[in-house]
Amino acid sequence: MSAPAPKGYQREAVVNALEIFRYAESQFRQAGDDASRAAATAFNGCLLLEAPTGSGKTLMAGMIAETFAAPDRDSNAQIVWFWFTPFATLVEQAKASIKSTFVGLRVRDLQGDRKTRGTKSGDVYVTTWASVAASNAATRKVRSGGEYVLSLDDLIAELRADGFRIGAVVDEAHHGFATAKEAVRF
């Protein structure tokens, strides 16, 4: 199954978001130093989809993620996504929805699939914000490496070294994205 045909306002939002992200990507590529790359990301590399319940924000986010990861345009990024849901009970639901709706996105398992070999643009790790940012035993496990998996921090560093951008979709941000300080640290 592929994504349903978007409604006019959804299509317009997706096109506008892609324009913003592609502009940020062009600025990032032209930047000559880390400070310029950080500025390009901070000023142009994020957006907020705010719309009423039932308007298809999750569908639009998936369409943006899928299209921006596609290798069919030079202005797209080679990107790995982290898709945050507000509650653990929604993780499996989000994974199933992404798998069934977006053929250009590949869901990966954050617990056991933290390796860079075989990574491709459009890979998506679905989890909760608390699972990577909170200070608890489960988070420490994800943030620690093992014999067969990298720590989350090392995974992100290696992906960046391999030329991947790191993208984040925060679904229902008002529910679980509590502390900006932890978000910046991540």
Walk through the language-model features, giving the residues of each.
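RecA-like P-loop NTPase motor core of helicase/translocase proteins
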Residues: 1-186
